Amino acid sequence: MVRATCLLASCVLFALLLIVPASAYPRYPSNYFREEGQYEPEEIMDMLNRLGNLIQMERKMENYKEDITSEKRALDLGLSRGYSGALQAKHLMGLAAANYAGGPGRRRRDAH
């Protein structure tokens, strides 16, 4: 008897879970069309301006993504060039440090 009651209660609960979300949806699609009157020209222009701004922002984001992915002067540690490329990168970094005024090497005395 307890099994049958539990089964019946679970079936009713399952049916309610299916019915409640379906009743929340509108019966007729409105498509954002107002039947009570004409649209104001200011509203239409405002909507078109917002749409234009969104399109411009999307284009800027696409260009920004392309600029980031195709960056030629990105930090390159030689990892993508193999072992010899990594050695060459270390050599070039050493040359750059040697050419730097405060870089490694023997400190020269000032000639006074």
UniProtKB/Swiss-Prot annotation:
A single GO BP term for this record reads:
neuropeptide signaling pathway
Q: Which cellular compartments is it found in?
A: Secreted
How would you summarize where this protein is expressed among tissues? Expressed in corpora cardiaca (CC), corpora allata (CA), antennal lobe (AL) and gnathal ganglion (GNG) (at protein level). Expression in CC, CA and AL detected in most animals, expression in GNG in few animals (at protein level).
**What is the name listed in the Swiss-Prot or TrEMBL entry for this protein?**
Diuretic hormone class 2
Record flagged with keyword Kinase? no
A single GO CC term, please? extracellular space
The UniProt function text for this chain reads: Regulation of fluid secretion. Stimulates Malpighian tubule fluid secretion.
The record's annotation in InterPro entries points to: DH2-like
Signal peptide as annotated in the record: 1-24
- Proline amide occurs at which residues? P104
| Residues excised as propeptide | 25-71, 108-112
Q: From which organism does this entry originate?
A: Agrotis ipsilon (Black cutworm moth)
Q: Which family does it belong to?
A: Belongs to the diuretic hormone class 2 family.
- GO MF annotation list: diuretic hormone activity; G protein-coupled receptor binding
Q: Which UniProt keywords apply?
A: Amidation, Cleavage on pair of basic residues, Hormone, Neuropeptide, Secreted, Signal
